[in-house]
A protein has these predicted regions:
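Conserved Class I SAM-dependent methyltransferase catalytic core
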Residues: 1-61
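Active-site rim elements
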Residues: 12-17, 78-82, 101, 108-113, ...
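Soluble or luminal CAZymes and related metallo-dependent hydrolases
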Residues: 18-22, 84, 180
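Bulky hydrophobic/aromatic "packing anchor" residues in well-ordered structure
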Residues: 42, 92, 160-161
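Flexible, glycine-/basic-rich loop-and-beta segments that form/coincide
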Residues: 49-104
Length: 180
């Protein structure tokens, strides 16, 4: 059984011990059905995906021995003989840019995207422009790292979403002034 769940860095795997939490409920139901349950937080980049995508993976077995944790095949650092993370450049290598259709950013969004270098987001805009660029979102909590975000050629992509031109999930091309 493999269950994916949208998560954030604040996700706490102790929820499996917290009555009322979804993870607690799932774990208890699986254990009641006779399964030995193992779960952990995994980053897809550590398994060869050219994007940073953290997910909880639950594995179950009827065996009395728990399923071992998954072993990464890639790393952000050169350790344990693992391959380096795959990058956005790796993912798009060989694609013909002339054949890539895309939508355009609005003029307002484009104004700020043009100011960003590869790998930057709204926090890299001049301080005096940040409130104007972010509007009401400027005063909200959370990291807001998806706003005015330009990809970096030599890093994995953030989680790829269906619509890369929406304000909170923007993915701008590393060097072209357009969404993916």
């Amino acid at each position: 059984i493999d269950i994916d769940d949208e998560i954030t860095r604040s996700y706490d795997l102790d929820w499996a011990k917290t009555p009322g939490s979804t993870l607690f409920y799932i774990k208890k139901k699986l254990e009641a059905a006779g399964y030995n349950v193992t779960f952990n937080l995994y980053n897809s980049a550590n398994f060869g995906s050219p994007q940073i995508r953290e997910r909880v993976v639950i594995t179950c077995t009827k065996s009395p021995n728990p399923v071992p944790y998954l072993r990464p095949t890639h790393s952000n650092e050169e350790v344990f003989g693992l391959e380096r993370w795959r990058t956005f450049r790796d993912a798009v290598a060989g694609l013909d840019p002339a054949r890539c259709d895309h939508i355009d950013f609005s003029e307002k969004r484009l104004k700020y995207i043009k100011m960003l270098k590869p790998g930057e987001n709204w926090r890299n805009l001049p301080k005096e422009l940040q409130p104007e660029a972010m509007g009401n979102s400027y005063h909200l909590g959370g990291g807001k790292t998806g706003f005015y975000r330009r990809l970096d050629w030599d890093s994995p992509s953030p989680t790829v979403v269906t619509h890369p031109a929406m304000p909170a999930t923007e993915l701008a091309h590393p060097t072209e002034n357009r969404p993916l």
